[in-house]
C-alpha cells in the first residue's frame, strides 16, 4: 500500500514507522521541521496521567503506563524513571486518603513495569528531600514514580528509526489539499495519489480538512500549555495542587535547572503560540505559594508553550478526555487527540483501522 502521513510530530512519526514496518511505501509530510511544534513543547514526561484516574480513564492510564516502559527500554539514554512527591496539606484540595488511593491504583495498573511502588513520606522526610518547600500545615507527601524524557531528542530518535525503515520524509513541505475520494495529496510542487492518507497534523488537522472541503464528525479544542524554566537543580519532581482548582502543576528537574508547568488556556490560532503574561504570573504565583525561595520574572531562563489538540469535551479542559479518535473517510484517516506517551499504541491502532 502507498501511504501519505501528514504531520511530523511524534504521532505522525510513529504512524509512518508503523506503516513502514508492515512493508508499505510511506511518505511523511511536515510543513516545518520534524518535532518542531507541540511534540517538543511538552512537560518532558512519559507518564500514565495520574490525575486522569479522577475522571475514570483507566484504560488510557493502563495503556500509557505500558507504553512508558516501552520508551525507556528502547531509548534509556533519553528517558528514565523519576520520583515525584505530592505534598499533602491539612485542608488541601485533595484528602490524603484520596491521593493515597490514587497512588495505589496507579501502581496496580503499572504492575510488571519494573517501577518502584509509591510510598508515604512524613513531613520531616519531605523537608529533607525538598528543603525549600513550605511546611506550614504540611502533613507529608505521597511519592510515586513516572518517567522524564528529552522530548525533542527522543522524537528525533524515533524519526531516525522511521527513516531506517524506508519512510521518505518531506520536511518544509506543507500539504495544501487532500482528496479522500481519489487519495490525492497536493503540495506546492506536486500532487500524488495514495491508497491511504493519514491526517495526523495535530493542532493543524482541522485546518487541513477545512482547506480541502472535508467535514468531520469531531471537533478539536486547542489548549495551550505554557512552561517556564528557572534556576535550581532538583533530584526529584514535585506535584503542586492548585487551590480552588482541580488542576496540578509540575515542578521538575530540567538539567541543571527547574521546569514549571503547565497551564491550560484555550488557543484559537495554532500558528501563534507563546506563553501569555497571565500564564507566567500564574506559574510564578503557584510556585511562590509553596516554596520559601521567591522567584520573579527576572529569574526566568526561558519560557515556552505548546498546543494540545484535545477531542472536544462538553465539560472543562481538565476533564476533557485525552483519548484519541481515529476517523475513516474513504482513503482518508483522521487522527484527533492522543498523548506523547501513547503515540506508538495510537500508530498501531491507525494501521489496524486502515485495513478495514
Predicted regions and their residues:
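Short hydrophobic core segments
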Residues: 6, 193-202
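C-terminal catalytic lobe of FAD-dependent flavoproteins
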Residues: 217-229, 233-234, 241-259, 266-356
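Flavin (primarily FAD) binding-site architecture
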Residues: 199-214
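Flavin (FAD/FMN) cofactor-binding and adjacent substrate-gating region
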Residues: 88-165, 177-180, 255, 293-296, ...
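N-terminal Rossmann-like FAD-binding beta1-loop-alpha1 element of flavoenzymes
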Residues: 3-27
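Dinucleotide-binding Rossmann-like beta1-alpha1 core, especially the glycine-rich loop
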Residues: 44-129, 249
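Glycine-rich FAD pyrophosphate-binding loop
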Residues: 20-41
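A conserved short coil-to-beta-strand element within the FAD-binding core of flavoproteins
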Residues: 171-184
Amino acid at each position: 500500500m502507498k501511504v501519505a502521513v501528514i504531520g511530523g510530530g511524534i504521532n505522525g512519526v510513529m504512524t509512518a514507522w508503523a506503516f513502514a514496518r508492515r512493508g508499505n511505501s510511506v511518505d511523511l509530510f511536515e510543513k516545518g521541521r520534524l518535532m518542531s511544534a507541540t511534540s517538543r513543547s511538552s512537560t518532558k514526561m512519559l507518564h500514565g496521567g495520574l490525575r486522569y484516574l479522577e475522571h475514570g480513564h483507566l484504560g488510557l492510564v493502563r495503556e500509557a503506563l505500558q507504553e512508558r516502559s516501552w520508551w525507556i527500554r528502547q531509548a534509556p539514554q533519553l528517558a528514565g524513571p523519576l520520583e515525584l512527591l505530592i505534598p499533602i496539606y491539612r485542608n488541601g484540595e485533595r484528602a490524603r486518603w484520596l491521593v493515597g488511593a490514587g497512588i495505589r491504583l496507579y501502581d496496580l495498573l503499572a504492575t510488571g513495569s519494573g517501577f518502584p511502588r509509591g510510598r508515604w513520606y512524613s513531613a520531616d522526610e519531605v523537608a529533607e528531600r525538598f528543603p525549600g518547600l513550605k511546611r506550614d500545615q504540611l502533613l507529608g507527601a505521597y511519592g510515586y514514580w513516572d518517567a522524564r524524557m528529552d522530548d525533542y531528542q527522543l522524537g528525533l530518535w524515533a524519526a531516525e528509526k522511521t527513516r531506517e525503515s524506508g519512510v521518505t520524509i518531506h520536511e518544509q513541505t506543507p500539504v495544501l489539499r487532500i482528496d479522500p475520494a481519489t487519495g490525492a495529496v497536493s503540495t506546492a510542487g506536486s500532487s500524488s495519489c495514495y491508497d491511504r492518507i493519514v491526517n495526523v497534523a495535530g493542532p493543524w488537522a482541522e485546518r487541513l480538512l477545512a482547506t480541502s472541503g472535508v467535514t468531520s464528525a469531531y471537533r478539536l479544542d486547542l489548549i495551550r500549555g505554557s512552561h517556564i524554566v528557572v534556576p535550581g537543580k532538583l533530584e526529584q519532581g514535585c506535584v503542586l495542587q492548585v487551590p480552588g482548582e482541580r488542576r496540578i502543576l509540575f515542578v521538575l528537574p530540567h538539567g541543571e535547572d527547574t521546569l514549571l508547568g503547565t497551564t491550560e488556556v484555550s488557543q484559537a490560532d495554532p500558528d501563534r503560540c507563546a506563553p501569555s503574561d497571565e500564564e507566567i504570573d500564574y506559574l510564578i504565583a503557584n510556585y511562590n505559594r509553596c516554596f520559601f525561595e521567591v522567584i520573579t520574572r527576572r529569574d526566568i531562563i526561558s519560557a515556552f508553550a505548546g498546543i494540545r489538540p484535545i477531542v472536544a469535551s462538553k465539560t472543562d479542559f481538565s476533564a476533557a478526555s485525552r483519548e484519541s479518535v481515529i476517523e475513516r473517510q474513504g482513503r482518508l484517516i483522521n487522527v484527533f487527540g492522543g498523548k506523547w506517551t501513547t503515540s506508538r499504541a495510537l500508530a498501531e491502532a491507525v494501521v489496524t483501522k486502515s485495513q478495514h
